[in-house]
């Protein structure tokens, strides 16, 4: 699998893949990375890529010409690129999207800055437009990294144990069940906090049943919207 990032600040992104799980996956050649800076495709002597909006309005906009050129150059490599634009007006990214997109050959994340990208570029290239929530960031780089991380977790071999995906939050519209580590009894300020006793008995069927019950309770409390969806699909 291949990921390309189109960004005015590629150095902000490269470091993310230098440690931990994703670094090991990259070393095993489970995915490849490319970074493209639109400034390298600007035709003016200052490598300028932004200008004022036609019709007025606050802020600057990333111009169509350099954005078109960089994306067209990616297209011409014929690596089956799938263009994803990061924009607050896009649909909210979720776990189902992460699973679906993990089957793509080559995802290109197009990261806007300033007040966004000339709309005509989206009309020409966008396969999908995503947001990660109803809030505004200074650029699309962080959402792109969030999405890339979530997608890669679903690529075979990236996680040490792919079975862990089955127990993670949002599977079957449930949050992941509460998890506990040693010690079995955690004591602070004369208070004792216990691990559920069923977890200590070694009966895997009963533990699995308890985890399902706890996941359901947790979802109902923290995410009633997900819980209703889970109940509807039973």
Curated annotation (Swiss-Prot):
Subcellular location per the Swiss-Prot or TrEMBL entry: Cytoplasm
Reaction catalyzed: guanosine(37) in tRNA + S-adenosyl-L-methionine = N(1)-methylguanosine(37) in tRNA + S-adenosyl-L-homocysteine + H(+)
Record carries keyword S-adenosyl-L-methionine: yes
N-terminal signal peptide: none
Binding site for S-adenosyl-L-methionine: 112, 132-137
InterPro entries: Alpha/beta_knot_MTases (IPR029028), tRNA_m1G_MeTrfase_C_sf (IPR023148), tRNA_m1G_MeTrfase_TrmD (IPR002649), tRNA_m1G_MTases_N (IPR029026), tRNA_MeTrfase_TRMD/TRM10 (IPR016009)
Statement: the UniProt record of this protein carries the keyword Aminoacyl-tRNA synthetase: no
PANTHER family in UniProt: TRNA (GUANINE-N(1)-)-METHYLTRANSFERASE
Record text on subunit structure and interactions: Homodimer.
NCBIfam families reported in the protein's UniProt record: PRK00026.1, trmD
Entry-linked HAMAP family: TrmD
Name of the protein in question: tRNA (guanine-N(1)-)-methyltransferase
């Amino acid at each position: 699998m291949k990921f390309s990032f189109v960004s005015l600040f590629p150095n902000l992104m490269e470091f993310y893949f230098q440690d931990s799980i994703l670094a090991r996956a990259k070393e095993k050649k489970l995915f490849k990375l490319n970074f493209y800076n639109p400034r390298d495709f600007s035709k003016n002597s200052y490598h300028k890529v932004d200008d004022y909006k036609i019709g007025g309005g606050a802020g600057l906009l990333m111009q169509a010409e350099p954005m078109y050129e960089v994306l067209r150059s990616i297209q011409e490599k014929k690596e089956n690129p799938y263009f994803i634009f990061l924009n607050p007006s896009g649909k909210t990214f979720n776990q189902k999207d992460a699973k679906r997109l993990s089957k793509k050959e080559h995802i290109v994340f197009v990261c806007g800055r300033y007040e966004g990208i000339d709309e005509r570029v989206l009309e020409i290239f966008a396969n999908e437009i995503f947001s990660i929530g109803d809030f505004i960031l200074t650029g699309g780089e962080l959402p792109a990294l969030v999405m890339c991380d979530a997608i890669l977790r679903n690529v075979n071999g990236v996680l040490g144990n792919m079975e862990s995906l089955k127990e993670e939050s949002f599977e079957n519209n449930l949050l992941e069940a509460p998890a506990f580590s040693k010690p079995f009894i955690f004591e602070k300020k004369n208070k004792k906090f216990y691990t559920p006793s069923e977890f200590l008995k070694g009966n895997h069927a009963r533990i699995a049943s308890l985890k399902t019950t706890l996941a359901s309770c947790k979802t109902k409390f923290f995410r009633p919207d997900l819980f209703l969806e889970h109940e509807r699909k039973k």
